[in-house]
Each structure stands twice: as structure tokens, then as C-alpha cells.
């Protein structure tokens, strides 16, 4: 069994559902310390939601003046869902038909194992490497992400730490390893809209004011709005409703208010402030009595073609035999926090078709090439 596969299986066995780490980072600390890394644990969050973070760094011969390449990842996984629907124990790595099954196999314990082994191999061959290698690992990426990567980034910022390159191990591939990497992500802006009316008997609408009826024209206008045209890197911004709550449960009562949850996934062609302003203008134009609470999940980020994307594309071509596609599709990731500290952030990992699903898995044949891609990037940028 290869060291990468063995480490992947060890991590999968640990039931690290957010925010639990279940010793995953202890395993990484043992491995990285043996390879010469200085490891620091950063614990954050309230008593009922303690998050474990790891910052590990091995300085090159140029010290802090040299380039620093960081791998970012998360040891936490999403819940399994109905265990009885899995063909095998989700926390017992199982091999079937050339695939490794287990929660976190694709998202993202294989990536973590791959980069750790790549770093071990790299420093063994290049003990006097010029640049530095870092690891930023959290147990709160799949959850609210308030006490994970963002806290470590804040800490590094206060120390004046400069990050030059960051590879995030998210599962970005689609059909085969390396066919897609993410060089950016859209921003996420959510709103909770409450439209007020007057509750009353449904048989006497003239004595009430139905907030659902009042809200519908405004919601229709919001759904039809063209927020922007996107750009060369991002598709147009989207606005989607996710929940509508109204009524008392009775069929003969006009509700006093209705609550609508919605979300923007927005490109660099728009700003949170601009989107908020336009939403309020549409609601005001319809004369609604409303309140609106906003939550900014993250701003968009983009890494244009440069040293990191070229190194990664070249490594993928050499190891996987495919021409990779740079993409900004999909949801948010911790890259949004790191991008404020690091000018070049690229996400790359195994295919994502099974992530968060029953019987999550990774092709065993992709595990060593993934590690080799990571090692080639280290060779190119910091040897």
C-alpha cells in the first residue's frame, strides 16, 4: 500500500464531522514534525463548537524572504446521512471496483494525504529547498466557518506573514483527475426579507392586508432582474429564492407577514453594496412595508493566469495527460478567506461527483497522480 493511500485510509477512519477533528491533525502534526515542520495548533470557537486549526511551516534556505507555498484543507466532513443506505461503514475505508469508499474520501482527506506525502518526498530530495512550505488545516470548513481558516488568516495577518501561493485541496475535477481547477469563486450574499401585512379572516380580505400578495410582484421583479453580464472569468450574477414562510398553518387566516430567504451568487462585475442598493430600490418601488437582514458569506476572488496556474497546469498535463480548464463555477470555499492574504490561490483535487453523497468515493488510480501533481508544483515553485 502506498504511503498516500495508507494516510488517506487513516484519516477516513476518524469520524471528524464538523467541528470535530478526531485526531486527524495530530496525525498530520506527527508526520509534518518528522519532516522538519514547525506546527502550531489554533483552537477557536465557543464551548459548544470548538474548532481545531493547524498552521505548519517549514522555512526554506531563503527564510521569510523566500516564496511561501501553502496547502489549505479541512479535516472535517459532512454528516453521513442514513448509514443504512451506505454499502459499507462510511468511516471504514472500503475498496470496491477500483474505488476507495468512505466519508471524506473525495472531500477532502485524499487531497490532504496527497500533499503531506508530496511534501515529505520533496523535503527528502531537496533538504536545502529555497522556498517555504506551509499547511493551513481546519476542522470547520463544512460548517459556519467562523472559527476555522478565517481565524488562522487573521492570526497570520497580525504577524505580517506573507503568502505567495496557495493550493486548496477541494475536489475540483469533474470526469477525470485534472480536467478542471478553480482559479476563483463567486461571492455569496444572502438576504432574509420580511414583508409585513395585516392578519385577518380569509373571508374578509378587505379588513386585512395579505403580505404574500403584496410581495409577489416585487419578487417577480427581483427574479427577472439582470444583475450583471458577468465577465471573461465569471458567469452573470444569479439571484435565487430558497425559502418562503407565511401563514399560521390554518387555511382560513390571512397571514400578518411573510418571510423570504434568498441568495446572490455574484461575480466580480458586482459588489455587495451595489446589489443591496438595487434590491432595496425594487422593494421600495413596490411600496412594501418590510425589513431586510443581510449576510455576506464571502466576496468573489480571482487568480488570473500566473506562476501558480502555469505550474499546476503543467503538472496536471505531465501526470494526468489532460489539458486542465480554469473555472470559477461552484460554491464558496475557504479560498475566499485566503485570497485576502495571498495573491495566487488555486483549488485542485479529485473528481467531485460523489461528495456529500451516500457512498462517497475516490478512484484509487487517481491517488498517486494527485500526490505527484502536488509534488511537481513544489518542485517548480520552491525547489
Swiss-Prot record:
Recorded E.C. number(s)? 3.5.1.18
Q: Where is the catalytic site?
A: 76, 141 (proton acceptor)
The reactions it catalyses are: N-succinyl-(2S,6S)-2,6-diaminopimelate + H2O = (2S,6S)-2,6-diaminopimelate + succinate
Entry keyword annotation includes Metal-binding: yes
Q: Which residues bind Zn(2+) 1?
A: 74, 107, 170
Tell me the cofactor note.
Binds 2 Zn(2+) or Co(2+) ions per subunit.
Highest taxon above the source species: Bacteria
Instruction: Write down the InterPro entries for this protein, in alphabetical order.
Output: Bact_exopeptidase_dim_dom (IPR036264), DapE_proteobac (IPR005941), Peptidase_M20 (IPR002933), Peptidase_M20_dimer (IPR011650), Peptidase_M20A (IPR050072)
State the pathway, as annotated in the record. Answer: Amino-acid biosynthesis; L-lysine biosynthesis via DAP pathway; LL-2,6-diaminopimelate from (S)-tetrahydrodipicolinate (succinylase route): step 3/3
Which terms does the UniProt entry file under GO BP? diaminopimelate biosynthetic process; L-arginine biosynthetic process; lysine biosynthetic process via diaminopimelate
Detail which positions bind Zn(2+) 2.
107, 142, 356
Known cofactor(s): Zn(2+); Co(2+)
The entry's function note states:
Catalyzes the hydrolysis of N-succinyl-L,L-diaminopimelic acid (SDAP), forming succinate and LL-2,6-diaminopimelate (DAP), an intermediate involved in the bacterial biosynthesis of lysine and meso-diaminopimelic acid, an essential component of bacterial cell walls.
Q: Which family does it belong to?
A: Belongs to the peptidase M20A family. DapE subfamily.
**Know the name of this protein?**
Succinyl-diaminopimelate desuccinylase
